[in-house]
Amino acid sequence: MLELNLTMQDALQSAAPNATLAAKLQLYGQFVGAWRADIEYRALDGSKRHAEGEWHFGWVLDGKAIQDVWIFPARRLRGERPEPWFGYGSTFRWYNPAIDAWHIAWFDPGRSIELRQIGRAAGRDIVQIGESQPGVLRRWRFTDIADASFRWIGDISWDRGVTWTLDMEMRAARA
């Protein structure tokens, strides 16, 4: 019998990775938990903006995918400083054995932004690449990965990947 007394959260979240894919899922599974993020955004004019954010990763959809929620400024700071620069987005990541890579779908409904990428391990790093608009590539990299910290780098290419420009960097530490 269908249990209709479960919440959406109960139906979405999983306690662990799905056993059939557990080894492959650890590429992003290593991030499951809560993180503090120091964020630096670099605008095209060279100016920089800083924010303290939070980033939460968890198992979802029968443990076959990982969802994260990325928030900046951190919720505890939202009332203290008016900040026109903000984000409240989410990413779904799921492994596709047919291509031995990850599908990534990120969206920020408050700013009406979305991006699809393909992600793969690159040595000790993780690299995700997708097209944000015709001819414009976005590359997101997880680097310097340790048990309690990592660095995330967002690059943009206006020439289909010939050259890249850093536009955002985050240093994350486990909360």
Where is each model-derived feature located?
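Hydrophobic small-molecule pocket/channel-lining residues, especially in calycin-type beta-barrels
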Residues: 1-175
